[in-house]
């Protein structure tokens, strides 16, 4: 069935209020969009950030008469009589199929492929990670994930113990295991990430080699030959002593989730524990690597 879409230009202070009112008016879904192409790279812990100029997009059943809703919105002091909005009719589509069509197998490095579960594997002889992008988090398309996957592909992980700090979907953990790691420990603050990592490990027949923990449950004596942390600059700095403690002497480290302008500061900070290499870059993002002193 077709839908009616109402787009309202507002700001971050009023977006949530408008969203609540539109839900009361019968909207079946609400999304927020960036009104002026303003990136938000690193929200604070627990924060759900919005852009200063935010577009509230509400979807209604096609039979809905929006005249009373728009009249109500005009009475709001922060919108006013002439508030900026647009009403559109949206034809129905097979949204799931359209979403699935956007995901294709991607190669990282020389050996590794990330393949959506519904796609044919391009090279059966390669190291193939079968991933369901609907489960959560990393799919390999983001530059930071790609940088980490390329780094893992470049290593000889045979019989190595690996830690994936901030494991998300488990894409890095599963890739490490498929590339020959002896075992991997995945750590994440999100229960959904733990579930997603477990599901993707099972899908790739490596679940028996993957241990998953919330931060408070990780073993106190945990150490690894290789540690990869694709999180953000703030947590990387805050967790640096713990991350350093988790890497064996001579072990390898990769850090990502960093903007180019953040890389040097984080590299300098980690240099008290690691011999750091030059940063690698992809688009606006960076990856740092080093060897434990």
Curated annotation (Swiss-Prot):
Enzyme Commission code: 2.1.1.-
Binding site for S-adenosyl-L-methionine: 145, 166, 188, 230
Annotated keywords: Cytoplasm, Methyltransferase, S-adenosyl-L-methionine, Transferase
GO BP field: methylation
Top-rank lineage group of the source organism: Bacteria
Substrates-to-products reaction catalysed: L-lysyl-[protein] + 3 S-adenosyl-L-methionine = N(6),N(6),N(6)-trimethyl-L-lysyl-[protein] + 3 S-adenosyl-L-homocysteine + 3 H(+)
Subcellular localization(s) per the UniProt record: Cytoplasm
Gene Ontology MF annotations: protein-lysine N-methyltransferase activity
One Pfam family per UniProt: PrmA
Gene3D superfamilies reported in the protein's UniProt record: Vaccinia Virus protein VP39
GO cellular component, one term: cytosol
Intrachain disulfide bonds: none
HAMAP family attached to this UniProt entry: Methyltr_PrmA
Family statement drawn from the similarity comment of this UniProt entry: Belongs to the methyltransferase superfamily. PrmA family.
NCBIfam families, per database record: prmA (TIGR00406)
Function: Methylates ribosomal protein L11.
Protein name according to UniProt: Ribosomal protein L11 methyltransferase
Source organism of the structure: Shewanella baltica (strain OS223)
